[in-house]
C-alpha cells in the first residue's frame, strides 16, 4: 500500500478525473479524484486520528480523518484526510510531513470506478425429468393412461446484476417428449361401469418340453410348448367356459393317426396319454430283459 501511496503524486486535472498515468515508475489507478481530500500513507501503528488531525490543521479546517483498519481493528498503515474548505491538494502533496521521524506518503485521494456491467455467469436451470406414463394392464375397451403430476419448474439461479432495476424471471415450460415409454409397468384396478360386461383374459404360461423316443420308430424327436396350469383369482367371477389357450398340439406325439383328426387335446388327455406311454415303455424294457 505504501508503493500505491507514492504513486499518487501525479497532477490533478481540471475536471477532477484521473486517467492511468505513470509517476516515478508507478502506475496510478484509474478513478475519480475526490476534491479536498488527501491520501496519507506510511502511518505508524501507534498513531491515532487526533494526532494526524493536528498535523494537517495548518493547511485548513479538517473535516474528517479516517484510518483504514482490518476486521480486528488493527491499522493498515494508511488513511484519508478531508478538509471542510477548498484547499490546494497539490501543495499539500508536495509538502514534507514527518511524524516521529518518519515521512508520510501523500497523494490525491482517488475513488476507483466500479464496473456496473459485471455479472456472474448464469447457472443452467435445473428442472425435473419428464413424467412417466403408466398404462393399465387390464384389457378394457376404454384405454386408461395414468400420468404422474409434474412439479412446477422454477429457475434456481438468475443473472446477478448490479443494475438498479430487476429483470423479469424467465420460466421454461417443460415438454414431455412424444413416445416416452417407462421401464416399468403400473397395475391399477380397472374402473368398471355398472352393467358393463367383464371379460377376463389371462395369458397362458408355456413351458418348453422335449420328447425323444428311440424304441418306437413312429415317434420322432419333437419340441412343443405345454401350458402350465394357472389359477384364477378368487375375487373374479366363475364362468363355465373352455380356455382355448390351454389346448396344444400334443396328440401328434403319441398317436400319429390323429395328427389331422385331433389337432387339439386338453391338458387332462395329455397327462393320460403320457402315463400310458411310460407304461408301454416299461413293459417293453421288461420283455427285452
Swiss-Prot record:
Keywords: Cytoplasm, Developmental protein, Differentiation, Oogenesis, RNA-binding, Spermatogenesis, Translation regulation. Residues 162-187 form the DAZ domain. It is found in: Cytoplasm. PROSITE patterns: DAZ (PS51890), RRM (PS50102). Residues 36-117 form the RRM domain. PANTHER family: BOULE-RELATED (PTHR11176), DELETED IN AZOOSPERMIA-LIKE (PTHR11176:SF4). This is Deleted in azoospermia-like. It comes from Gallus gallus (Chicken).
Amino acid at each position: 500500500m505504501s508503493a500505491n501511496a507514492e504513486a499518487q503524486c501525479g497532477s490533478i486535472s481540471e475536471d477532477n478525473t484521473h486517467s492511468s498515468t505513470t509517476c516515478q515508475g508507478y502506475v496510478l489507478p484509474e478513478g475519480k479524484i475526490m476534491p479536498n481530500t488527501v491520501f496519507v500513507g506510511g502511518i505508524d501503528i501507534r498513531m491515532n486520528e487526533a494526532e494526524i488531525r493536528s498535523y494537517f490543521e495548518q493547511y485548513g479546517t479538517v473535516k474528517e480523518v479516517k484510518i483504514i483498519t482490518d476486521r480486528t481493528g488493527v491499522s493498515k498503515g494508511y488513511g484519508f484526510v478531508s478538509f471542510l474548505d477548498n484547499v490546494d491538494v497539490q501543495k499539500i502533496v508536495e509538502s514534507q510531513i514527518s511524524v516521529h521521524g518518519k515521512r508520510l506518503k501523500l497523494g490525491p485521494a482517488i475513488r476507483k470506478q466500479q464496473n456496473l456491467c459485471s455479472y456472474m455467469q448464469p447457472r443452467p436451470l435445473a428442472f425435473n425429468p419428464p413424467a412417466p406414463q403408466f398404462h393399465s394392464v387390464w384389457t378394457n375397451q376404454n384405454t386408461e393412461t395414468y400420468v404422474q403430476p409434474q412439479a412446477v419448474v422454477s429457475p434456481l439461479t438468475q443473472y446477478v446484476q448490479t443494475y438498479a432495476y430487476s429483470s423479469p424471471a424467465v420460466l421454461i415450460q417443460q415438454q414431455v417428449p412424444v413416445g416416452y415409454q417407462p421401464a416399468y409397468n403400473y397395475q391399477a384396478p380397472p374402473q368398471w361401469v355398472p352393467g358393463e360386461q367383464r371379460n377376463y383374459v389371462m395369458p397362458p404360461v408355456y413351458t418348453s418340453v422335449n420328447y425323444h423316443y428311440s424304441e418306437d420308430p413312429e415317434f420322432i424327436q419333437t419340441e412343443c410348448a405345454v401350458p402350465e396350469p394357472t389359477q384364477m383369482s378368487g375375487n373374479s367371477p366363475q364362468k363355465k367356459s373352455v380356455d382355448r389357450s390351454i389346448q396344444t398340439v400334443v396328440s401328434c406325439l403319441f398317436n400319429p393317426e390323429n395328427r389331422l383328426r385331433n389337432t387339439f387335446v386338453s391338458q387332462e388327455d395329455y397327462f393320460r396319454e403320457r402315463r400310458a406311454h411310460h407304461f408301454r415303455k416299461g413293459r417293453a424294457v421288461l420283455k427285452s430283459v
